[in-house]
A protein has these predicted regions:
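Aromatic side chains
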Residues: 20-22, 35, 91
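A generic structural micro-environment signature
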Residues: 7, 30, 63-66
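Compositionally biased, intrinsically disordered linkers/stalks adjacent to structured regions
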Residues: 66-103
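Glycine-rich loops and low-complexity Gly/Arg-rich segments
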Residues: 44-48, 61-65, 82-85
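A short, exposed loop/beta-hairpin motif centered on an aromatic-Gly-Thr core
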Residues: 50-64, 69-74
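A short, structured beta-strand/loop element
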Residues: 31-55
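Negatively charged, low-complexity tracts enriched in Asp/Glu with abundant Ser/Thr
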Residues: 1-23, 28
């Protein structure tokens, strides 16, 4: 798995900082590429890492631009890893047909 792009953001809540990373991931798939997304949240308190949460959806589409659009959607709305599938589920169901078109 390769990382093609990373979008980072932070949210401050009382004495805790939550750092979000949204990664566009790429992997070889049959004779082409498949793109997915990994989301990670790191919680810091007093500059000490206290919690990490991560989730990913691999092989969303073989069309990089579509997956980049989803990456921006997640970053713009500061979606946490736990809600990744809830937010992207219908997009993933639609975009998976891109692989059939490529065959």
């Amino acid at each position: 798995m390769h990382i093609d792009n990373i979008l980072n953001d932070s949210i401050f809540d009382s004495n805790k900082e939550m750092k979000y990373s949204y990664r566009l991931i790429r992997e070889n798939f049959f004779d082409g590429q498949a793109y997915g997304i990994e989301v990670e949240r790191q919680d810091f308190s007093n500059n000490k890492l206290i919690y990490v949460e991560r989730n990913e959806i691999r092989k969303i589409s073989n069309t990089k631009g579509k997956v980049e659009g989803l990456l921006n959607l997640l970053s713009d709305n500061k979606v946490s890893p736990i809600h990744l599938v809830d937010v992207l589920g219908s997009y993933v169901d639609e975009y998976v047909s891109d692989f059939k078109e490529a065959l």
